Regions:
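Catalytic-domain carbohydrate-binding cleft regions of carbohydrate-active enzymes
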Residues: 1-203
Length: 203
């Protein structure tokens, strides 16, 4: 399909992604992680899958936000949306027969709106860092240990990843949690980052 699209539209960039894949397919498009479930364990798994897919060359990747199968709760959807803010493939997708999970069906619409606004505010960063990785045969999403190789603790952290050169993603991935502990390597500076117009005040 990728070769056919390039032949039909040689002067245009194409957007192509698939569930099935093989090594080398990243030259033609991206991949999503398949039919996941609306489970907290799958939310955490999707965080681990992003660097793994990047290592195989798949920079354009992502999971079905909220999970594809089973019934998504509002809390799980909010956490998935938060995790996915920096992930290139950003889509809510669910199976027929599961609870409808379009964002407008939940009660905290204002919270979802703010998350989506933040996503849109970050698109220039995502695009810039994504293209840097693509042009340099690098990774857009990577484990802490790839950047902080001299830090033994960085090798133990599996629920925080780097998105581009300047942002670390450390989402809440457990049910009934209002926060989490975050490991900051010594060279890293933490800044407040809560809304699309609020990312300069140091804490």
């Amino acid at each position: 399909a990728g070769e056919a699209l390039r032949e039909m539209e040689p002067d245009k960039r194409i957007l192509l992604f698939s569930r099935s894949s093989y090594i080398g397919m990243h030259r033609y498009g991206g991949v999503w992680t398949g039919d996941n479930k609306s489970w907290w364990s799958h939310l955490k798994l999707s965080l681990a899958q992003m660097p793994a897919l990047n290592m195989c060359g798949f920079l354009y990747s992502g999971s079905d936000m909220g999970g594809f199968g089973a019934d998504c709760t509002e809390d799980l959807m909010a956490r998935w949306l938060s995790l996915a803010i920096l992930i290139p493939l950003y889509r809510n997708h669910a199976c027929t027969g599961t609870r409808l999970q379009e964002l407008y069906r939940f009660t905290h619409l204002d919270d979802f709106k703010k998350l989506i606004e933040l996503r849109y505010a970050l698109i220039p960063y995502i695009y810039s860092e994504f293209m840097k990785a693509a042009l340099r045969d690098g990774m857009y999403m990577k484990p802490l240990s790839f950047e902080y190789g001299d830090d033994p603790r960085a090798f133990e952290i599996e629920d925080q990843i780097l998105a581009g050169e300047s942002i670390m993603l450390a989402p809440v991935v457990e049910q009934n949690r209002t926060g989490r502990n975050v490991y900051l390597p010594e060279e890293m500076k933490m800044i407040r980052f809560r809304a699309f117009n609020d990312y300069t005040e140091e804490i």
